[in-house]
Every structure is written in structure tokens, then in C-alpha cells.
């Protein structure tokens, strides 16, 4: 592993720029660009006076060449466009009405969106095309692109469907539908595939939506335990334990970070595939599905863990019946009076989620990670550090291969 130093506060964001470069940003307002192979800090981008609240990258063709761009937003109510090749700040917007919480690039329309207390649509040259104002303290916290020029945006307990209407060079944005099926704040909003997207709330509600007609296709209310008492503190604790902090999908499965646990759902079968109620010692903050039935997670406990879906040889740990309700919870309505169930309900396709790797290196909560596949894995943390993790065996094989290739080239000469 390689420890990268350069930040002076919590590092919250990692964004891939290309096959070799990535950007990091956080509460110190700095944006640093790194080479994943060497660990070198290539550029230091200084502009924002307060913490970074959102960051994204995109590529575009100018002339015949491909170019990369980086957009950053800060709680100082500014937006900046950067050239990651030169480190120059190409554009800067400083008269925003509120801080931007999320960014979304629409490559097909050649525009990008910023979400906060208002939804703004910008062209590539940072010119404001249109905006819609919302008088909400929560504002827009997440956005996903939908077919036919629609956008889904999470606003507190609601998902608002916006339509982008194009007329010549003019763009107009308008709210078309308010989806108010969640009972608590939406923490995660992701695209699953061209036809589906998903949302997860603070009290464990996972809803899968149709991307075209915005109807509910599946509903999971994750309830593995009833509140142990009637006090407000105990109820609040249980809500935190089942809060969906993050979700990711490969189009076929969804992995949800629920409290300190992990839950994997089969989208087509509309059923749970595997789960770990205590996957970490504290809240899971970020997840990622990999190939071959593997997934990764990182947590406030400072660890990054690698998991594998395996066939279930023995009955899994018991769970409340409420967890397995597809269209609502069912089963217990009050406190459990008898001993806990010891037999797992018969669920077709249920598998176990087995720990196969544990990366320990950070002294603070791991906020997120970024995979460069064989080149390595990058993590960032509240300890102000980044770490590049590499597969030692794979790196040895790659070095050996490079040596053999060099020998062959020399022999040909």
C-alpha cells in the first residue's frame, strides 16, 4: 500500500479522470490530482475557501481530440470548472443562492446540472441555461438521469421528476411529478439500468422505480429488529441502524449499506440474495459491486472489506419476517413474546455473504473508495489521508511480464 499526504482535513470525494488519474477533495477546500500508478500528486487546485460539497468529471471531444474536465462545488457557494491537464481554472461562478449538494453531467445533451435549493442547468461553457427554485431547507441531495430527457431528484422525503424541454438552443426545466412514497429522508438515489432506478431512506425503505412511468416495481422495508423499548432514544437508535446510507448496482443486483450491515437484492427476481446484519463495527459509508459475485464496502470503523457471494451450505442467521416483505412489511406488529426464530425462512436463491479480505490502514472513517482494477484501489478518510492499495501477487506478475517483454524486445534487436 502507498499512503498519500496532501490534504489538511477530511477527504470525502474521489473522482476518476482517466485510466491513470484521479482527483481528491474534502473539507480543506483543496482539489488534488494524483497518478494512481506512481502515487505522485500532479496538480494542486486552489480556489474554494470552504469545504467541497460535490465533484464530478467528464470527457468531451474538441476538434479531434478527447479532453477531460473537472467540476467542483463548495459550501462557499461557488462552482469551478478545471482543466486537469494544466490545472487552470477555466470558469468560476460565485453568485449562487445556495450551496450545491450534487452534480450531474448529461453527455447526450451536452449540459450539466447542479442541485441545491435550486436546480440549475448549465452548458459546457458554464453559461446558465435555466433554473427552478425550491423553497426547501433540505434542497436537492442527489440526481439521476432518466430516459427521454427526464431527471429524478431527491428532495427530503420526495423524489421530484423534472423534464428538460429543448427548443432550438433554449432549454427549459419543469417539475412533472412528485413521488411521495417514502416516509423519511432519502439518503441514496441511484440508476440501476436503462429501465429502473432505486432510492433508499433513513428508516430502511428501498424502492425500485420504473424509469419511464415512475411506478413502484418493488418495495423493501428493511426491519430486522423491533424497537426494544418505547423511549425516543431507543427508537432513534433503531432508525440509525437501518438507515440506507449508500447503494450501488451493476444492473442486475443492488447492494445497500444499511446501518453497519450489507444487503444484496436481485433486481429481476425482486428478492434478497444475501445479507450481513453486522458487516462492519460501525456504519457502512460506501459500497461497490465487482465481477464474479464479489463486492466491497468501507465504514466508519476505518476498514475496507471484500466480500464474496457463496452458496449457502447451512441455515443463515435468523431475521425478522419484515425484512423479506417485497411490497411492505408483514408479520409481527408488536413486541416479540416468544423466543427468536432459529430457522431461516425458505427463500429461493438465498446465498451467504462471506468475508474474504480486510484492508486496515486508516485511523479514521473511510469515506469512499475508487477502483482502478488491476492498477489498484484508492481510499480516502477522515484521517486526512489517501491510500493506494495494490494486489501484491498481481503486481509481481505484471513486473515479471514487463521484464520478459523487455528481454524479448532486446533479443529481436
Language model segments and positions:
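Conserved beta-strand element within WD40/beta-propeller blades
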Residues: 22-26, 70-74, 111-115, 151-154, ...
Amino acid at each position: 500500500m502507498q499512503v498519500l499526504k496532501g490534504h489538511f482535513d477530511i477527504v470525502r470525494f474521489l473522482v476518476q479522470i482517466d485510466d491513470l488519474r484521479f482527483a481528491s477533495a474534502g473539507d480543506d477546500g483543496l482539489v488534488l490530482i494524483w497518478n494512481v500508478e506512481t502515487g505522485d500528486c500532479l496538480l494542486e487546485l486552489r480556489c474554494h475557501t470552504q469545504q467541497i460539497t460535490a465533484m464530478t468529471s467528464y470527457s468531451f471531444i474538441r476538434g479531434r481530440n478527447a479532453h477531460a474536465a473537472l467540476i467542483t462545488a463548495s459550501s462557499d457557494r461557488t462552482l469551478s470548472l478545471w482543466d486537469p491537464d494544466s490545472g487552470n481554472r477555466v470558469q468560476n461562478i460565485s453568485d449562487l443562492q445556495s450551496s450545491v449538494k450534487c452534480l450531474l453531467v448529461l453527455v447526450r445533451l451536452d449540459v450539466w446540472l447542479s442541485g441545491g435549493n435550486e436546480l440549475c442547468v448549465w452548458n459546457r461553457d458554464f453559461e446558465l441555461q435555466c433554473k427552478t427554485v425550491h423553497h426547501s431547507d433540505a434542497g436537492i441531495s442527489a440526481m439521476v438521469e432518466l430516459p427521454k430527457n427526464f431527471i429524478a431528484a431527491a428532495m427530503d422525503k420526495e423524489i421530484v421528476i423534472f423534464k428538460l424541454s429543448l427548443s432550438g438552443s433554449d432549454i427549459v426545466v419543469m417539475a412533472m411529478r412528485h413521488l411521495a412514497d417514502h416516509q423519511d429522508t432519502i439518503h441514496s438515489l441511484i440508476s440501476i439500468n436503462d429501465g429502473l432506478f432505486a432510492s433508499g431512506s433513513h428508516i430502511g425503505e428501498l424502492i425500485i422505480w420504473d424509469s419511464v412511468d415512475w411506478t413502484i416495481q418493488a418495495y423493501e422495508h428493511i426491519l430486522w429488529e423491533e424497537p426494544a423499548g418505547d423511549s425516543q432514544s431507543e427508537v432513534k437508535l433503531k432508525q440509525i441502524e437501518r438507515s440506507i446510507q449508500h447503494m450501488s448496482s451493476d444492473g442486475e443486483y443492488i447492494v445497500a449499506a444499511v446501518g453497519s450491515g450489507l444487503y444484496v437484492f436481485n433486481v429481476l427476481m425482486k428478492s434478497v440474495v444475501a445479507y450481513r446484519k453486522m458487516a462492519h463495527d460501525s456504519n457502512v459509508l460506501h459500497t461497490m459491486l465487482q465481477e464474479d459475485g464479489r463486492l466491497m464496502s468501507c465504514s466508519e470503523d476505518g476498514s475496507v472489506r471484500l466480500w464474496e457471494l457463496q452458496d449457502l451450505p447451512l441455515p443463515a442467521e435468523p431475521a425478522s419476517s419484515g425484512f423479506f416483505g417485497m411490497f411492505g412489511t408483514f408479520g409481527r406488529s408488536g413486541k416479540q413474546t416468544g423466543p427468536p426464530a432459529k430457522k431461516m425462512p425458505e427463500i429461493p436463491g438465498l446465498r451467504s455473504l462471506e468475508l474474504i479480505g480486510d484492508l486496515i490502514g486508516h485511523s479514521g472513517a473511510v469515506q469512499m473508495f475508487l477502483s482502478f482494477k488491476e492498477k489498484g484501489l484508492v481510499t480516502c478518510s477522515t484521517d486526512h489521508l489517501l491510500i493506494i492499495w495494490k494486489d501484491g501477487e498481481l503486481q509481481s506478475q505484471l513486473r515479471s511480464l514487463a521484464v520478459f517483454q523487455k528481454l524479448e524486445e532486446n533479443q529481436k534487436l
